[in-house]
Amino acid sequence: MSTPSGLIAPHGGQLINRIASDAEKQEFLAQGDRLPRITLDARAQSDLEMIAIGGFSPLKGFMEQKDYELVVEEMHLSNGLPWSVPVTLSVSEEIADPLKEGNWVRLDDANGRFIGVLELTEKYHYNKAHEAINVYRTDEEKHPGVKVVYEQGAVNLAGPVWLLERDDHPLFPKYQIDPAASRAAFQERGWKTVVGFQTRNPIHRAHEYIIKCALETVDGLFLHPLVGATKSDDIPADVRMRCYEIMLENYFPQERVILAINPSAMRYAGPREAIFHALIRKNYGCTHFIVGRDHAGVGDYYGTYDAQKIFDEFDPQALGITPMKFEHAFFCKKTEQMATSKTSPSGPEDRIHLSGTKVREMLRRGELPPPQFSRPLVAAELAKAMHD
């Protein structure tokens, strides 16, 4: 389904906007001291922001129990739309008990600033182990996503939200592009087909290869790295962003690429998160989404191509965004170029496999990744950052 502008429609048909108007904001601020308050952690705050700007359309707030249970068990909302990851606000029993359904709740950031409100429609208990097994395919607490589930409160608070305060990103304000703005940018450029690429790593040669393969078949690329909460051993966002800038300045046609930050937090939910990431990019205006090996995976919890296979479980029209599935790319010594097993004549001994993990390991040892791994300008930037 497309909009009158010719762009793909947001998930559910309407781009949600839950940013309070000035008048609404003043009304809520005037009540602030009288409202019960909750302090949001980094993930809940990024979820609030993504709901408000329409990145999580059709969600208007944190999930009620009927949606939560359907998403956990069947990967659909109660209105039938595909949705694969629960978006919830979890608090302790002590915080939840005095809150009354039908009332407003003040949402504060970690500094105690009043940034949003929740119209509490429901509070409910949930089964953490059930969520972990269904969403993450494991209940092991060493899995970073499962760890978050087990550490969060026992009660979910549900209801529509309004965002009152939102800062420019402290490091990347010029790349803070909301779904309404990305859609306007695609339309201005005349792009009818746009491929989205999600990453939390610097772009190495395997990434570059599959991105350029995808770009051959569409009008534009939406490079959308995640800068919300990630694992502690991931390369810092400021270093990654500089690497993306270097890649675009030197190795891509700049008029066919838009770089923007994705403020949402990683769940590390593997296959389910691949669906989640695709739907988010649909809301930003993408028609296609790149799914490579072990998308949004961690450790050995998911099969190499499980994140591609999960798309086959959905009606393509209901998803409304086309996955572009790529095999693991490598440097082929026989042909001296990037390839996959679909295009390379070489055997395993002539294939140099690349990964963000290998790059990080080399950098920690003080080694520069070879040009088959990483573009020299990017490798130099990574090495500089590692030893600053």
UniProtKB/Swiss-Prot annotation:
InterPro entries: ATP-Sase_PUA-like_dom, PUA-like_sf, Rossmann-like_a/b/a_fold, SO4_adenylyltransferase_pro, Sulfurylase_cat_dom, Sulphate_adenylyltransferase
Enzyme Commission numbers on file: 2.7.7.4
Top-rank lineage group of the source organism: Bacteria
The keyword Transit peptide is assigned to this record: no
Pathway, per record: Sulfur metabolism; hydrogen sulfide biosynthesis; sulfite from sulfate: step 1/3
Entry's Gene Ontology BP terms: hydrogen sulfide biosynthetic process; sulfate assimilation
HAMAP family named in the record: Sulf_adenylyltr (MF_00066)
Similarity comment text for this entry: Belongs to the sulfate adenylyltransferase family.
The protein's name: Sulfate adenylyltransferase
Organism: Picosynechococcus sp. (strain ATCC 27264 / PCC 7002 / PR-6) (Agmenellum quadruplicatum)
